[in-house]
Amino acid sequence: MNLKQQLNKKPNLQKHLFERGYLITDDDYSGALHDYPFYGNWKEYVFGDYRFYVYQTVSAFFQQIGNRTFFLIGHAYDPYNMEPDENKLLQYIGKAYGTDEYFDRLDELTGLFIFGSVCGNSIDFTVDASGMQYGCYGTVQGKQYISSHMRLIGDLCLLETDDYVKRLVNYKWYHYMMGNYMPGDITCFRELKRIGCNTYVSFDGSGYSVERFYPKKAIKMCQTDAEYNEVIKEAARIMMNNMKLIPMKWQRPAISLTGGIDSNTTFAAANGVYDKYTTFSYISMYRESVDAEKAKQISDKFKVKHVVYQIPEKNEDIADYEIYKAIIEHNDGDIGTYSDSDLRKKITLIKEDVCEVEVKSWISETIRAYAYKYFGRTKFKPDLKPRDYSSLYKIFLGNRKLLKETDKYFAEYIQNTKLKEHLFNYDESDFFVWEMMHGGKCGLDIGVMKGCFDITIPYNNRKLLDLLLRVPLDKRISDRHHLDMKKLMNQELYDMNIRVVNLNETDRRKKVINMYYIINTHLPF
């Protein structure tokens, strides 16, 4: 499908292309803002040598401090200082520029954003704690590009999809194990790299450099019950502060609620401000009906309005299904297809007036030792090799050439971001979940979902995540820490004992995928 031709025929759908995106460049597109791919939906700001093109519904904040302009595109709030105002946060962080406090203050932010500063032709930038605001960057024909969407840069610069990426996304096992995303920090174009969460990218006029600023030091694990209880108490306080701050920023926040532990804990954190929230669920397949039923039961108990969205069962029941599909997959980078049921869900929520912002419970998996859960393991070796990363990433038993190429991209990522030098005593498998599964995949997913509504994630705070990584591994695997947080924040909800387990996480599936991991990491080729 020629997307440009189709959108010319459907001007009412043009607004969904690269929706809620941004582009930072030293090239000038001011005369093209009414053409493809902008279609008159973007605004422009100019600071230093750079032009900031931002989708019309996205907030952009700029603060001048000395000779530097600090910027934040998206949203942020600080649960440690109870500050919801991005301009004040820019001042707070920017004044610490060049000191050790700079990144410490940045670590306190919850939100989805790209943050950085500009001075003349130099620019530096990073993304939120888990990269839920996706970002990629690179030099094309002597011009600098930083964007929320790799295909936006590709469309503007007529870039060609990398040959490795073409072969990867057409590989028969590519869609398994967490869906569509790229290894390491690559994108679909050789010219562009993904902005890795926990790293800071700088351009000095001649080239890019990447600095890892987290972790900074060894983590202090909980050794006693008293230390564990203090961690739970502090984590609960920060989560509840986040849930108090969200209604200060949006008029109609809604928690996407299921019977699972992640959103249950989020809902518990809203205790005391339930009158500020609604909840919603959707049913696109049978197993989701169980989640929706439990979500309604929880909401009714605490007198919170709950809405269930029934997703059509057939593609034909959704007008313009094929063009929506093309837009969504292009926004995602054209790095794989979505299932029909997932597309029907997204399109339905795009068309519904669900909320102003969804309070989403992603990123919780980082602190729930998700690699251990997914593979049914109780132990990973402390020093993972590129082959371990590839084996955690995709199933490659049938294509060793593709596997070796993938190994190479993970090796480059580990080296370029200096991950090994900063691991200290952290569990490396947590960083695969944090920086690959979340930063690499979920950031792209969020970029697509923001076509439905804005999204915020109360777990997405580096200081909070680091705090909960102090919890002993057995408690993280069993979700004891989440249950204890929920009990502390809302005893009544805890006493309801509602827990719907992901039906995909069967013991048989875990055994099979773990056997693959063992075999693939031991084969010498």
Task: Identify the role of each PLM range.
Residues 1-17, 23, 121-124, 132, ...:
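ATP-dependent adenylate-handling active sites, centered on carboxylate activation for C-N bond formation
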Residues 98, 165-166, 491-500:
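Short, surface-exposed acidic
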Residues 521-525:
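Radical SAM enzyme core and accessory elements
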